[in-house]
Amino acid sequence: MADFKSLGLSKWLTESLRAMKITQPTAIQKACIPKILEGRDCIGGAKTGSGKTIAFAGPMLTKWSEDPSGMFGVVLTPTRELAMQIAEQFTALGSSMNIRVSVIVGGESIVQQALDLQRKPHFIIATPGRLAHHIMSSGDDTVGGLMRAKYLVLDEADILLTSTFADHLATCISALPPKDKRQTLLFTATITDQVKSLQNAPVQKGKPPLFAYQVESVDNVAIPSTLKIEYILVPEHVKEAYLYQLLTCEEYENKTAIIFVNRTMTAEILRRTLKQLEVRVASLHSQMPQQERTNSLHRFRANAARILIATDVASRGLDIPTVELVVNYDIPSDPDVFIHRSGRTARAGRIGDAISFVTQRDVSRIQAIEDRINKKMTETNKVHDTAVIRKALTKVTKAKRESLMAMQKENFGERKRQQKKKQNDGKSLRS
């Protein structure tokens, strides 16, 4: 049976992994680590929770330890929380070697980040927008070292290769060595057409061919076999009452859960409503200052909060192994988003539940999801109409009303409205 040493990782790194109680490589690690160490570009696709981070961090750290220079590798990822999580893993793995890791994301001090970059960290973990800002506005003493980077990693590559990130990604890549002078590693849980098209790109002169690997899941279902998928038919106007009843029913009253919503406004309403109802709750969405986002995650990981209300900021890659329940409070329009959300539970062989709240408007979305995952959802009987009306409706309605009044008083969402107005004004001036 293969171990990390036989895959080619440095002895010091295998000892670090052992100290973290990671002794057996996963399928994607077995496949990708030797190929990356050979110098090949790599596209790695695997289910969530399969160990993709170590698949690229392991060989990068091994090569760095042979030639420990500054700005050795750049990892780009779509969200701040993912960047911080990846940085934590790099730091933990390289702790015995005095590794310097810099996190460059929005919501943090630009000045402090510029100072960090001037110190030439060994690895930069960044979101494209903030790194692009430094490249465009900082001097050569800050970002000039990027031109010597040996590795570029796109984590959650299917998201980074969309039009949303196109301009910032292009700016980041422009500051790095050309393709034939660096290794490019793409990792994702969803192999999209854009990712596949890169497999057919011509091989760079003097470089070995690209290595592409995708773990096939049982029956081509992109979700863990230990995940139970259910739905509840819910009237739109009383969703909050159904949620409260579900979270406080006998089966789930002591379990950790992530509640996924489509809008920041919904996340904030639910957080405040559940807090009024004395549920230990935290939230994670783009309208929160970065420090609050970080604190929310820490509270949830430490079980100070039992429930995390989140937009899709939390659906990608975040490793919170103890999540026992995922609730799709709002159904996503993209079936792959459902897969990523549901992948926050039933990780590493554990059992988990994913329950979707289905209103009359969601039927076509549920059918699309079932087609994508090749599995039918079953209706759960954990919450009944009569139970909701009898136990929850009155107090939940009161708590929601008080939450909405408080949000109105605080002008929640005003910053976002002003930003949108500025963008629209700018478009008007250009047209």
Swiss-Prot record:
<dbReference type="GO" id="GO:0000480">
    <property type="term" value="P:endonucleolytic cleavage in 5'-ETS of tricistronic rRNA transcript (SSU-rRNA, 5.8S rRNA, LSU-rRNA)"/>
</dbReference>
<dbReference type="Pfam" id="PF00271">
    <property type="entry name" value="Helicase_C"/>
</dbReference>
<dbReference type="GO" id="GO:0003724">
    <property type="term" value="F:RNA helicase activity"/>
</dbReference>
<dbReference type="InterPro" id="IPR050079">
    <property type="entry name" value="DEAD_box_RNA_helicase"/>
</dbReference>
<dbReference type="GO" id="GO:0032040">
    <property type="term" value="C:small-subunit processome"/>
</dbReference>
<dbReference type="GO" id="GO:0005634">
    <property type="term" value="C:nucleus"/>
</dbReference>
<dbReference type="InterPro" id="IPR027417">
    <property type="entry name" value="P-loop_NTPase"/>
</dbReference>
<dbReference type="GO" id="GO:0006364">
    <property type="term" value="P:rRNA processing"/>
</dbReference>
<dbReference type="GO" id="GO:0005524">
    <property type="term" value="F:ATP binding"/>
</dbReference>
<protein>
    <recommendedName>
        <fullName>ATP-dependent RNA helicase DBP8</fullName>
        <ecNumber>3.6.4.13</ecNumber>
    </recommendedName>
</protein>
<dbReference type="GO" id="GO:0000472">
    <property type="term" value="P:endonucleolytic cleavage to generate mature 5'-end of SSU-rRNA from (SSU-rRNA, 5.8S rRNA, LSU-rRNA)"/>
</dbReference>
<dbReference type="InterPro" id="IPR011545">
    <property type="entry name" value="DEAD/DEAH_box_helicase_dom"/>
</dbReference>
<keyword id="KW-0539">Nucleus</keyword>
<keyword id="KW-0347">Helicase</keyword>
<keyword id="KW-0547">Nucleotide-binding</keyword>
<keyword id="KW-0690">Ribosome biogenesis</keyword>
<dbReference type="InterPro" id="IPR001650">
    <property type="entry name" value="Helicase_C-like"/>
</dbReference>
<feature type="compositionally biased region" description="Basic and acidic residues">
    <location>
        <begin position="411"/>
        <end position="431"/>
    </location>
</feature>
<feature type="short sequence motif" description="Q motif">
    <location>
        <begin position="2"/>
        <end position="30"/>
    </location>
</feature>
<dbReference type="GO" id="GO:0005654">
    <property type="term" value="C:nucleoplasm"/>
</dbReference>
<keyword id="KW-0378">Hydrolase</keyword>
<keyword id="KW-0067">ATP-binding</keyword>
<dbReference type="GO" id="GO:0030686">
    <property type="term" value="C:90S preribosome"/>
</dbReference>
<dbReference type="GO" id="GO:0016887">
    <property type="term" value="F:ATP hydrolysis activity"/>
</dbReference>
<dbReference type="GO" id="GO:0003723">
    <property type="term" value="F:RNA binding"/>
</dbReference>
<comment type="function">
    <text>ATP-binding RNA helicase involved in 40S ribosomal subunit biogenesis and is required for the normal formation of 18S rRNAs through pre-rRNA processing at A0, A1 and A2 sites. Required for vegetative growth.</text>
</comment>
<feature type="domain" description="Helicase ATP-binding">
    <location>
        <begin position="33"/>
        <end position="209"/>
    </location>
</feature>
<dbReference type="GO" id="GO:0030490">
    <property type="term" value="P:maturation of SSU-rRNA"/>
</dbReference>
<comment type="similarity">
    <text>Belongs to the DEAD box helicase family. DDX49/DBP8 subfamily.</text>
</comment>
<dbReference type="InterPro" id="IPR014001">
    <property type="entry name" value="Helicase_ATP-bd"/>
</dbReference>
<feature type="domain" description="Helicase C-terminal">
    <location>
        <begin position="242"/>
        <end position="389"/>
    </location>
</feature>
<keyword id="KW-0694">RNA-binding</keyword>
<keyword id="KW-0698">rRNA processing</keyword>
<feature type="short sequence motif" description="DEAD box">
    <location>
        <begin position="155"/>
        <end position="158"/>
    </location>
</feature>
<dbReference type="Pfam" id="PF00270">
    <property type="entry name" value="DEAD"/>
</dbReference>
<comment type="subunit">
    <text>Interacts with ESF2.</text>
</comment>
<feature type="binding site">
    <location>
        <begin position="46"/>
        <end position="53"/>
    </location>
    <ligand>
        <name>ATP</name>
    </ligand>
</feature>
<dbReference type="InterPro" id="IPR014014">
    <property type="entry name" value="RNA_helicase_DEAD_Q_motif"/>
</dbReference>
<dbReference type="GO" id="GO:0000447">
    <property type="term" value="P:endonucleolytic cleavage in ITS1 to separate SSU-rRNA from 5.8S rRNA and LSU-rRNA from tricistronic rRNA transcript (SSU-rRNA, 5.8S rRNA, LSU-rRNA)"/>
</dbReference>
<feature type="region of interest" description="Disordered">
    <location>
        <begin position="404"/>
        <end position="431"/>
    </location>
</feature>
<dbReference type="GO" id="GO:0005730">
    <property type="term" value="C:nucleolus"/>
</dbReference>
